[in-house]
Amino acid sequence: MIYTNSDGGSRGNPGPGAIGIIVRKEGRILQKYSKFIGERVTNNIAEYEALIKALELASIHTKDEVTCILDSELVIKQLLGKYRVKHPTLLELFLRVQKLQENFKKIRYLHVSRWNKFQKLADELLNDELDNQGYKRYYKK
């Protein structure tokens, strides 16, 4: 089974945003990915963009089972049908996730703390990306 840890964030909310993704199998990291996604991005949009990229990357490694691990309670609950998707931009991203799910036999979503080992690594990737784009952190590493 493939596991993904994805994280999206912005500095300012909205503000400059980036995503970070870890793709793993049997405890081994297969891929690390980060990308700057725009100047005026909300945290929720960044979280969805990160999940979309995580699903795209996972589909390179498997068409079978994938577990997507996120620290965004909102995204998880929307995907599980516990929260409605009201915002038009989030709805568009939600529908993209739904379409990407068709690439897999089984998909599972798991909410974890931002302090989870691999979640922290995904967070570091996105924050390093923002640093590299010239958007310095409000706090020291």
Spell out what each predicted region is.
Residues 1-45, 56-60:
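RNase H-like nuclease fold core
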Residues 128-130:
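Active-site proximal helix-loop segment of RNase H-like, two-metal nucleases, encompassing DDE(D)
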Residues 5, 9-13, 52-125, 134-137:
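RNase H catalytic domain
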